[in-house]
Regions:
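A penicillin-recognizing enzyme superfamily signal
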Residues: 3-13, 17, 39-56, 61-64, ...
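C-terminal substrate/ligand-recognition segments
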Residues: 144, 148-161, 189, 195, ...
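Short active-site loop at a secondary-structure junction
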Residues: 143-149, 172-192, 205-208, 239, ...
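Mid-domain, small-residue-enriched loop/turn segments at the edges of structured enzyme/sensor domains
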Residues: 222-230, 261-298, 307, 311-314
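Conserved catalytic neighborhood of penicillin-recognizing serine enzymes
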Residues: 202-265, 309, 321-351
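A generic secondary-structure signal for well-formed alpha-helical elements
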Residues: 14-22, 196, 200-204, 215, ...
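Active-site SXXK
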Residues: 7, 158-159, 182-210, 216, ...
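Conserved short loop/turn motifs at secondary-structure junctions
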Residues: 1, 29, 180-181, 281-290, ...
Length: 439
């Protein structure tokens, strides 16, 4: 469809443009012995990650005898075989349905040595495959440094999935970042905390001090108390709930989860469409739950749809050649939140994009406000359509998220490396407003 084409182009344009290039510049500042991983990684942990990637590669499996180099049939078809020169080898057994190909058997040690030798190969880039000469080990590090993305757009009233971009290139990366991958969702979870507070009597204009809130953890926990910081480490002023959500303030969100409890928030998130398990810990307020992009967008769509969750579907109906319907999905529809509260949450989420007013500082700010302002450095600025939103950034800039909400369409985007130990070194670069929002 046209919308699917727009979505795929948006993902490609952003990653192939400035984002991947800025990530590679960021990686150059890291010591060679740790890149592309974060600098604090333990050398043994780094080596373990690389070993897993090596053994998962087709090149290794073909050498070790777990994959046929000729027809790519897996281990069931492959049996030990004595080659004509007397050496031990492998046979893609024709009696099992294999192609009959034979090749020399190699040990793990021999494969490790082979992975350090340069060979001609094609490697992935967002601008197209590149012919180069690399050792297979260096090609693993190259793949680790690739940024990935997922995007899904859902029509709130019908649950129809209008666009689904599971990854950046199916030929090279057979993994779905929309319905399969579960990652920590960061601050995109906060609207469910604020919705719980509003449903139980809070008002968007209620004022809270921007100061640290500490919550006692179960006995034996280390540390014994949870006291989250704001990402900008700015404290002191009095802010409204609306301003706190628009600017993703951890201090106020922690106060809400302390006052209203984790169970109420978890129950609401499930009612709105979250299906994954959510840990019963206070830090869910800041997004430690690992969810799929699909369920997160579905729950945001319920907020737009007056609090009513409509189960997502990819098929509207199937007809026979005469136009008679032979299949129509039976979608689950349920009210997860009352209409009034859902409306007020959406109004608060508009502040993310439009900005929310802070009486004490005399400023209008929101984490997604760059969508509204013109800039020569961005090609997505000056957007004027009515929109709500929520940015999200997980710990150490591992994942970047953005939820964009309009009356007719809710779109969610995730951006990050496949391996959580590969990430931007600064929040300026790694925040969801920079990595995911532009898509």
């Amino acid at each position: 469809s046209r919308m699917q084409g727009y979505a795929e182009n948006a993902v490609h344009q952003h990653l192939a443009g400035e984002l991947q290039a800025s990530f590679e510049r960021d990686l150059r500042d890291r010591p060679e012995e740790v890149a592309p991983f974060f600098e604090e990684i333990d050398p043994e942990a780094r080596q373990a990650i690389i070993d897993v990637a090596m053994r998962d590669s087709d090149r290794y499996k073909k050498g070790i005898g777990k994959l046929c180099p000729s027809c790519n049939r897996p281990g069931f078809y492959i049996t030990p075989h004595r080659l004509a020169d007397g050496r031990d080898g492998h046979l893609c057994n024709g009696e099992k349905g294999g192609c009959g190909h034979t090749w020399l058997a190699k040990t793990d040690e021999e494969m490790r040595e082979a992975f350090d030798l340069p060979v001609a190969m094609k490697v992935f880039s967002h601008r197209g495959a590149v012919d180069t000469v690399l050792s297979p080990m260096d090609s693993i590090l190259h793949r680790k440094a690739i940024l990935h993305a997922g995007l899904v757009s859902i029509e709130p009233a019908t649950g129809y999935v209008k666009a689904w971009v599971g990854g950046i290139d199916f030929k090279h990366f057979q993994y779905d970042n929309v319905g399969q991958s579960r990652r920590q969702v960061g601050s995109t979870f906060k609207p469910f905390v604020y919705a719980t507070a509003l449903r139980l009597g809070a008002e968007p204009c209620d004022e809270f001090p921007n100061q640290k809130t500490c919550i006692d953890l179960p006995p034996g926990s280390d540390p014994p108390r949870w006291c989250p910081d704001n990402s900008d480490e700015d404290y002191g002023e009095i802010v409204t709930l609306e301003y706190a959500l628009a600017n993703s303030m951890n201090t106020v969100t922690a106060k809400l989860i302390k006052d209203y409890g984790t169970k109420r928030v978890i129950d609401l998130a499930h009612a709105l469409g979250i299906e994954s398990d959510i840990p019963n810990v206070p830090s869910i307020a800041l997004g430690v739950a690992q969810l799929t992009l699909q369920e997160l967008v579905s729950a945001n769509a319920a907020l737009v749809n007056h609090g009513v969750h409509v189960e997502p579907t990819y098929i509207a109906r199937i007809e026979d050649r005469f136009g008679n319907p032979i299949y129509e999905p039976l979608q689950e529809i349920r009210e997860g939140l009352d209409d009034r509260t859902a409306y007020r949450v959406i109004q608060m989420m508009k502040g993310v994009v439009d900005g929310a007013w802070n009486e004490e500082t005399g400023t209008t700010m929101g984490t997604g406000i760059r969508l509204r302002y013109n800039s020569d450095k961005r090609d997505y600025d000056g957007i004027r359509v009515p929109m709500a939103g929520k940015t999200g950034t997980t710990q150490n800039n591992t994942d970047g998220w953005f939820m964009g909400l309009t009356p007719e369409l809710v779109t969610g985007v995730w951006v990050g490396a496949q391996d959580p130990t590969v990430r931007f070194s600064t929040t300026r670069l790694g925040q969801g407003a920079n990595t995911a929002l532009p898509i």
